[in-house]
Amino acid sequence: MAVPFRRTSKTRKRLRRTHFKLNVPGMNECPNCGEMKLSHRVCKSCGHYNGKEVTSK
């Protein structure tokens, strides 16, 4: 069975883990009410999407 030849150093381990991070969601300002909303989704506060009212609040 294969075993590691050398112990992985703290630096190598941390450099490898720099890519294991969460991304910030893309937030935009709603053109209708000005609240922050996720891109390509209906605004939670006013119910508008793409300039049209999709849901009634």
Swiss-Prot record:
<dbReference type="InterPro" id="IPR044957">
    <property type="entry name" value="Ribosomal_bL32_bact"/>
</dbReference>
<keyword id="KW-0689">Ribosomal protein</keyword>
<dbReference type="GO" id="GO:0006412">
    <property type="term" value="P:translation"/>
</dbReference>
<dbReference type="GO" id="GO:0015934">
    <property type="term" value="C:large ribosomal subunit"/>
</dbReference>
<dbReference type="InterPro" id="IPR002677">
    <property type="entry name" value="Ribosomal_bL32"/>
</dbReference>
<protein>
    <recommendedName>
        <fullName>Large ribosomal subunit protein bL32</fullName>
    </recommendedName>
</protein>
<dbReference type="Pfam" id="PF01783">
    <property type="entry name" value="Ribosomal_L32p"/>
</dbReference>
<dbReference type="InterPro" id="IPR011332">
    <property type="entry name" value="Ribosomal_zn-bd"/>
</dbReference>
<comment type="similarity">
    <text>Belongs to the bacterial ribosomal protein bL32 family.</text>
</comment>
<keyword id="KW-0687">Ribonucleoprotein</keyword>
<dbReference type="GO" id="GO:0003735">
    <property type="term" value="F:structural constituent of ribosome"/>
</dbReference>
